């Protein structure tokens, strides 16, 4: 995938992240985004829908890190609260933008 003209490798179903106890990561210098397997998202009694929602949220989260880094905004990329907020709110924002016809 390309993030602002820079190629990133996307590694889905990375079992190594389970051992590290993280759902995903964006390796800025290596230009790699890694995501843990869908079936290993969340713990306990999580439903398949909950796991899919978390998987998508983690994917957005890591891509946002990459966008901030490629924009020269590494301080924003290091702000997990901001990155989480954008990852969680983006689908809602996109829906409004689409309704308004302002996605171009």
Task: Identify the residue ranges that each predicted region occupies.
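Short, basic alpha-helical nucleic acid-contact segments in DNA-binding proteins
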Residues: 89-96
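Long, well-structured alpha-helical subdomains associated
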Residues: 98-104
């Amino acid at each position: 995938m390309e993030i602002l003209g820079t190629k990133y490798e996307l590694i889905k179903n990375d079992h190594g992240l389970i051992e590290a106890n993280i759902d995903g990561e964006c390796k800025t210098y290596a230009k790699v985004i890694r995501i843990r397997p869908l079936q290993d998202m969340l713990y306990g009694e999580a439903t398949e829908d909950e796991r899919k929602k978390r998987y998508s949220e983690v994917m957005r989260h890591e891509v946002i890190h990459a966008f901030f880094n490629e924009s020269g905004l590494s301080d924003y990329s290091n702000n997990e609260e901001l990155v989480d907020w954008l990852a969680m709110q983006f689908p809602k924002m996109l829906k409004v933008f689409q309704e308004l016809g302002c996605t171009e």
